[in-house]
Amino acid sequence: MLFNIIQDVAIAHDHTAIALTMTEQTVDYIDVAIRCGYALNEKEVDFILTGCSSGLGMQLACNYVPNLICGYGTSEIEANLFASINQGNAFSYPFSLNWGWASEEKYRFVLHALFKGLNDLPYPKVPKEEVQRKIAATEKLKDLKKTAQIDFEAFAEVYQNIRN
């Protein structure tokens, strides 16, 4: 059901959706975040849609993975601002928190806003100087993240050693 929603929205915004499925029964959200990292770092995908019960554990786990910048949101404005301003490559959504009547439609609206944000220029109604300052701040954050983390290959090796 959720993947059908993702596919519909992706197609509406000229993107392709693929499901990165796992058959292991013993994986947790940390394992899923690592697999997301593999997919992005190996250029299998250019954006990840993910989530968990609250969405926050998945976001945190993804943000520990080198080269992943994962946002979180439950509203259209949060999704759009994350995509257009923070320019991350992953987005986490809560699939149990407040999930109920019409939740699938709310998720659809959030995804539309997210995909629209991926194609929007950041800060369309803000003076050019302010836009440049905010884009520079986003780039600074990305540079700091790269500096603070080991490269993905070393990270993956550490992960394998922890799992074994």
What is each stretch, according to the model?
Residues 1, 80-164:
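C-terminal binding/interaction regions
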Residues 1-14:
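Glycine-rich phosphate/diphosphate-binding loop of Rossmann-like nucleotide-binding domains
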Residues 12-27:
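A short beta-strand-loop structural module common to alpha/beta enzyme folds
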Residues 18-21, 48-52:
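Short, conserved beta-strand edge motifs with alternating hydrophobic and charged residues
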Residues 31-48:
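Short, structured active-site "lid" loops
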Residues 46-50, 69-71, 88-92:
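Structural motif
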Residues 51-57, 98-99:
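Gly/Ser/Thr-rich loops at beta-strand to alpha-helix junctions
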Residues 57-70, 74-78:
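Short Gly/Thr/Asp-enriched flexible loops that form oxyanion-binding sites at enzyme active sites
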